[in-house]
Amino acid sequence: MTVPALASVSGLLQVASLLGLLLLLLKAAQLYLRRQWLLKALQQFPSPPSHWLYGHSREFQEESELQPLLKRVEKYPSACARWLWGTRAMVLVYDPDYMKVVLARSEPKAPVLYRLLIPWIGCGLLLLNGQMWFQRRRMLTPAFHYDILKPYVGLMAKSVQVMLDKWEQLVAQDPRLEIVGPVSLMTLDTIMKCAFSHQGSAQTDGDSQSYIQAIWDLKNLIFSRLRSAFLQNDIIYRLSPEGRQCQRACQKVHQHTDRVIQLRKTHLQKEGEMENVKKKRHLDFLDILLFARMENGNSLSDTDVRAEVDTFMAAGHDSTASGISWVLYALASNPEHQQRCREEIQGLLGDGTSITWDHLDQMPYTTMCIKEALRLYPPVPSVGRELSKPITFPDGRSLPAGIILSLSIYGLHHNPQVWPNPEEFDPSRFAPGSARHSHAFMPFSGGSRNCIGKQFAMNEMKVVVALTLLRFELAPDPSRIPVPIQGIVLKSKNGIHLNLRKIP
């Protein structure tokens, strides 16, 4: 290469280096200004000292995250700031008055948090905002009409009995049982039969276990990514081992939901079947999606349908399984309340050969115990919102638009200013006529974006508790006490292990 050519290359490299340095300086300035803006915005919300780079991340390790949260709930009234890393912060909210103000507004889900779910569940009801969310919510609400929910009770009972039959065989050999796995299979079986008109049994189908494992993998991977500054970039994440594992898990999940959708489409194509379904007063969840016409006259796309199926398949079995497992553990840990529930159910159902819709409103003490367990162990421990406009709270503190709020349902439910002796299991908190703040108890979130399937979930919990207590006495396994840890849903670090004794 000639001297002039070398000089030209050297000059280009110098220019490129200068441009690169300039871009780095601009990015550094942007990050600095962002941090200064956050410091000013959050100055009314104190928090423990944080590191300039990694924030409070060392304090909030996954396996101990709930304990520092509860310390903050006691120390900082109503809300406090939490720094994830240098330029990423949020405000933790755990006060019912604050919750009420936020949930009265139609704030969007925080994209910085929820966008990580898109490869898994797409842009369905959980992630939509604005008019698109309103239209989809209105379209899907009839799927949870009481006329639809009534016959589901029988389907739920059949799925529960399959699980209990398996438990009876297992405890004949060993009374110790880990319940999260089988409860997850049962709730998947239930949601597939009720909402997706599935004819088989997820509890005996080997494919269902691989689907549940993929769901567990996705929850762990996404929650770990949320906590990592390095993995926020989509390109870096796709190239990482975690990103490739996430892609494989998404593929398994989508294969499962595609198969469910295709089976229903095939069934509807049978002669006369589509007309029979259309004559029904209320359509099932999947049929609403398949028959839906948006207001502009176009059908939902295949992508839209799968997003809703992925969303409700996951939420309908996973969060419900978490709730049921913790409810059974709470009853196992409080035998006097367990026995009172059992006596109530025996008086109502006798031998328990059948349970119907009408029975569900006739078990008040059991319902009180379920609600108290959901207070102690809310299935979804937090939800995120991003302020679209400034907000002022009842105590006069305010936040500007653009701030992320983490509405800590777990913190709210364990707030001693809201619930005296919050760690004590006390079903009388939910006795008829007992007074409490309208936003003190939110196991299914609140406001217009509350859980659309909350009645379905409560019904299933009642069916499970009733039929289980008729067949088994429950006790905790003292050698393996569950350790609640934060996640997309509330989970236990070491599973939920019970000792079961068959009732003669």
Swiss-Prot record:
InterPro entries with a match to the protein in the record: Cyt_P450 (IPR001128), Cyt_P450_CS (IPR017972), Cyt_P450_E_grp-I (IPR002401), Cyt_P450_sf (IPR036396), Cytochrome_P450_Monoox (IPR050196)
Catalytic activity, EC: 1.14.14.57
Ranges annotated as spanning the membrane: 6-26, 110-130
Superkingdom classification of source: Eukaryota
GO molecular function, one term: heme binding
Similarity annotation: Belongs to the cytochrome P450 family.
Keyword Oxidoreductase applies: yes
Gene: CYP4A21
Enzyme class, spelled out: oxidoreductase
Organism: Sus scrofa
Chief subcellular location: endoplasmic reticulum
Topology relative to the membrane: Multi-pass membrane protein
Listed name of the protein: Taurochenodeoxycholic 6 alpha-hydroxylase
Organism lineage string: Eukaryota, Metazoa, Chordata, Craniata, Vertebrata
Function (record text): Catalyzes the 6 alpha hydroxylation oxidation of taurodeoxycholate to produce the pig specific bile acid taurohyocholic acid.
UniProt subcellular location: Endoplasmic reticulum membrane
